[in-house]
Amino acid sequence: MSVDKIELPNYKLKHELWNSITHGLGAIFGIIALFLMLLKVCGIYPNNDVIYDKEFIYKIIGVSIYGFGIITCMTISCLYHALAKNNGKRVFRVIDHDFVFVLVACTYTIFCLGSIREESMWNGLVPYSGWIIFVIVWALIALGITMNSINIKKYAVLSMIIYICAGWTIIFASDILFTKLTLSGFLLLLGGGIAFSIGAILYGIGKKKSVWWHTVFHIFVLIGIILQFFSVYFFVL
């Protein structure tokens, strides 16, 4: 799809200002979150001894990917909404949608590598559940990014379906996650997923009625990110 054929929403300056601010705040939160997670994993806090073994390495990798996902997704969204209407904004619209998928995959990565990597789900029937979920989610995300990049308008519905399916793949490992995260951690993870889904559904239903629904979507994304960060920080690391 050629760049000049990519349609841009008819947002006014005040709408784009709020869209940019909300995810600009998300980018700042992502930087702080990554810093705090690295501090915790590396054991810089007093009386927190770190064993530099395989578990430590996987958590460092998982945290780095997770933090990267939050920061880049929020930053790209902020920049996209801040740009004037030109071909640059059209390109960033596609990238912005792509990185929503990336955020989902990066969030899964820390849970898969840091919590359930070698655990068995379904009462021990399926070993290495973390790796299986990891591969499935990244495969779905790759498909979603491909479809979205080929034609953002033509495959909009398919992309949304893939986004929701990828986001809820975690239900297949809900039994082991509930055990590993405890009730509080699991509810934070679940709450984040619900926030993402509600935001996407409300935006899909309301976008033709009011452009403010996109800002509402941004707010729900921020809520989802914050809830899942708490799940990671307190119950995975």
Task: State each model region's role.
Residues M1-L237:
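Multi-pass alpha-helical transmembrane bundles in non-GPCR membrane proteins
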